[in-house]
Amino acid sequence: SPDFAPYEFYAIDENGDPQLAGFDPALAKYVADYLGLELEIIPMDFDGVLAELANGTVDLGMAGLSPDPERADAMDFSDIYYLGGQSFVCLQANADKFPDLASTNKAEYSIGAQTGSIQVGLAEENSPDADIVLLTKVTDIIAELIGGKLDGAYIETAVAESYAKNYPELCVALEVPYDVAGSSIGVVKGN
């Protein structure tokens, strides 16, 4: 899911061509080299990563994947390789509207989350009265925030901070408690 910097994203190489970059592709290459295997990375939307793992059509999935217990029926997980967190993001100009998580729960708010992500559950849990808008790419969530179509969004902290650094009109307004703080590699069940 190459819209999830710093986990995975496209960077422009010295020839002006987009190249997959980030710490997930770097870790995947390291693991493949260590095991003496050939690595093939297939970029896809996040919800596609989950579906392909569940169907067994890929060997592993690396997409800032949280080892959520609800996913355990469909896949196995590596140990956590990155400890992170969850955040609520909004426009800097609207940060005062969100002093705490309870303030995100208003029917007049549109709150974004990435389809298939744990952030959907966080939105449903913390902002159940809001209009929860599911989008397949984090880049679409960011565009909707900046364009004023979303009031806020639930995004993994490292990703939220990366976007806020590149788009100063954005603000990481709140830390969001979550029991599973970190990322692991999703592996085909029983593999």
Q: Where is each model-derived feature located?
A:
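Beta->alpha turn/N-cap motifs
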Residues: S1-F4, I42-D47, G56, L60-D68, ...
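Extracytoplasmic small-molecule ligand-binding "clamshell" domains
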Residues: S1-G64
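Extracytoplasmic
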Residues: P2, G22-F23, Y34-G36, G48, ...
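Soluble non-cytosolic domains of exported or imported proteins
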Residues: P18-A26, M44-D47, A113-S117, T136-T139, ...
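Short helices/loops that flank or line small-molecule/ion binding pockets
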Residues: Y30-Y34, I42-P43, D47-L60, A74-D76, ...
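Periplasmic-binding protein-like
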Residues: L83-Q92, T157, E161-N191
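Flexible hinge/capping segments at coil-to-helix
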Residues: L91-S110
